[in-house]
Amino acid sequence: MCKRGEKIRVVGVSRGNEYSPNHVDNDAAILRLAAEALERMGCEVTIYPEKEFVAQNIEGEFIFDMARDRATIERLKKLEDGGALVVNSAYGIDNCVRQQMTELLVANEVPHPRSFIISTDEKFTPSVFPCWIKRGNSHAMVKEDVVYVECR
């Protein structure tokens, strides 16, 4: 795949291991397979770990990522705003954080399990057991971030 007679250079950004609880190998395989598919189409692909992508101030016109780190997401937003094509948009990543996603689904009347967003400082009284209690400020990072509760 060429652009103006030159190979298209694509930047890939891997997900930090801390954001892939129990799925480090799976996430690495997904990114590797995407990179290999782009290379078969003639692209030149360079993969960077999240922290290196930010620390080295990497730029690119075409970027694909599995980012979750806040600094990486902010860097991707700046690149997107500057015209880079980012597959797995940083804005989309932010919209998939549990609280934001739940609020968007409910506000747009998308069918969604009954959900409550509460502060950990608040008393939770609705009788909705059994239920799932999920971390709201981020994606699950440890197994305890998503817990099934059968009764009070």
Q: Language-model segments: what does each one mean?
A:
Residues 1-87, 92:
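ATP-binding N-terminal substructure of ATP-dependent carboxylate-amine bond-forming enzymes
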Residues 2, 10-14, 80-83, 91-152:
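Active-site nucleotide/adenylate-binding loops and adjacent lid/helix of ATP-dependent enzymes
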